[in-house]
Regions:
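Charged interaction scaffolds used for protein-protein
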Residues: 1-163
């Protein structure tokens, strides 16, 4: 878990395909492998970092950070830590709006909902790319019906002449 600390968000975001499709643990996996609060503990660190990053005068309290971490862990247990690191980096970069006056957990969870839509689009594109690659591979060896009939007739004629 310490491998995925906020300091590597910048490195992780450089390869968004790896964030989306790489072999990284999900929040649910963290809970299963370590303890059932591992994802909340990990998210606490990420959210605290975001809280400190923002230039807002009014920061979230420890309780708000904890509640936000629990909400994300409960609702988005299927997200990989790499995806969440991409999200937090993008949030800091202003992809999902900004805070007005105070750091608001609702802004974070609303932004995460938007991120999940983007994730869905990336997954659909990825699946489509894989499908197209398979189709193109199939086409390399494919023949038309007419070519198949000619091949079949040749085989049939060869069989008849050898008998």
């Amino acid at each position: 878990m310490t491998t995925f600390n906020p300091d590597i968000q910048y490195v992780m975001q450089q390869d968004k395909d790896d964030c989306y499709f790489g072999r990284y643990p999900t929040l649910a996996r963290l809970n299963k492998e370590y303890c059932n609060t591992a994802s909340v503990q990990w998210l606490n660190i990420q959210i605290y970092n975001l809280n400190e990053y923002c230039g807002c005068k009014d920061k979230m309290t420890q309780q708000q950070i904890l509640d936000c971490a629990r909400t994300i862990s409960g609702m988005y247990y299927f997200l990989k830590v790499s995806e969440l690191m991409l999200f937090f980096f993008r949030f800091k970069a202003g992809f999902y709006g900004k805070f007005f006056g105070s750091v608001d957990p609702m802004v974070i969870t609303t932004a995460l909902s938007q991120f999940c839509k983007e994730r869905g689009e990336a997954n659909a594109k990825h699946d489509n790319d894989i499908r197209m690659k398979q189709i193109n591979e199939f086409r390399k060896n494919a023949i038309s019906y007419e070519e198949w009939k000619k091949t079949r007739n040749k085989k049939s004629n060869n069989t008849n002449t050898t008998q």
